[in-house]
């Protein structure tokens, strides 16, 4: 059995936080792991900005729900499903990804969790410091062959342990280094 592990944002969907930035007019919220590779640092910055500006989880969810899949994403995932198990390994959060998972036909999603109080994102909980890498290592320990695709720094950990790894929609400044 073979599994294809895909990143979500930038690979299958636009970046949610770029839409949040556009909706709020706060440019800094549009930064992604392409700009700040340390995801913990990136999330701390986002939470601080959101708190200072009264931006709620519902605002982020509305931004996510307003996004369309990248061209060809749904047909790509459906074609993969004909021959592989498909897993979305993303550094997003369940509360943010729900509307996009619906548009993708609810593939198996492994991601992180937000801590929310009264619609305010107060913190986050990483499933594992290197969740993407850990997931693929776990699948492989069960005898699965794994293929991985993503678009940014945080996807390289998947490529290191997958049987094959591929960049999709990666900026040249990232893909040319690997």
Cite the ranges covered by each PLM segment.
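Residues that cap or flank secondary-structure elements
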Residues: 68, 89, 127-128, 147
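Alpha-helical segments flanking ligand/cofactor-binding loops in enzyme cores
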Residues: 78, 137, 156-160
